[in-house]
């Protein structure tokens, strides 16, 4: 159904319809309220939903107010009220000025990188505290660390000389574990039984972990591993670091605890 003109009230057909100021007009009826000049969509100006030309467009006028003591008092009172409201809003919203951030893959990558950097810095501070201020105190920890690493890499070498000091009654004690090995007393064949037992003991008795991320060593006493590698002979140093051997490569050293999970 065709609408009525806002000026004359007659029906407006599509060929002569002007849709402007939320109303419908005839092209001839769309003129200035003051001078009756015909307007179009480019040169009209609307005021209270009525068309005006540029010359007769109503202009806002401002009234000058004298700075009387009463007006100054009201102005000062308004400013004080504004400050009080601002302070109330500030105290009310204090501590709430944060926004929820979506957990995107990019943010997860940045978080993972920051965790690695913090772990490296923590490791550096830990090593500096172990080295000590003087040179003599720093040498001993290095020697102890070298001894510890050698003991972790070659657990059998630390205990291998023990069978040579076993008394003559030791072969009798070891024979039931070897399922009736030849009882010939050679002095060198029978001590091999405790050596084999000691090599298998750390692998079965020590803790085993599986890597869940790839990690590249950032220091000489760390080890590199890949996702899915098995870490054996694991010992907990602190909440952030462990000590163990990568079964695939045989390397022994420190590794971050948040990169592995227990098997």
UniProtKB/Swiss-Prot annotation:
GO terms for cellular component: cortical actin cytoskeleton; cytoplasm; focal adhesion; postsynapse. InterPro entries: Lasp1_SH3, LIM-SH3_domain_protein, Nebulin_repeat, SH3-like_dom_sf, SH3_domain, Znf_LIM. Keywords: Acetylation, Actin-binding, Cytoplasm, Cytoskeleton, Ion transport, LIM domain, Metal-binding, Methylation, Phosphoprotein, Repeat, SH3 domain, Transport, Zinc. Residues 148-162 have a biased composition (Polar residues). The modification N-acetylmethionine is found at residue 1. Phosphorylated. The modification Phosphoserine is found at residues 99, 118, 134. Residues 3-63 form the LIM zinc-binding domain. This is LIM and SH3 domain protein 1. It comes from Rattus norvegicus (Rat). The gene is Lasp1.
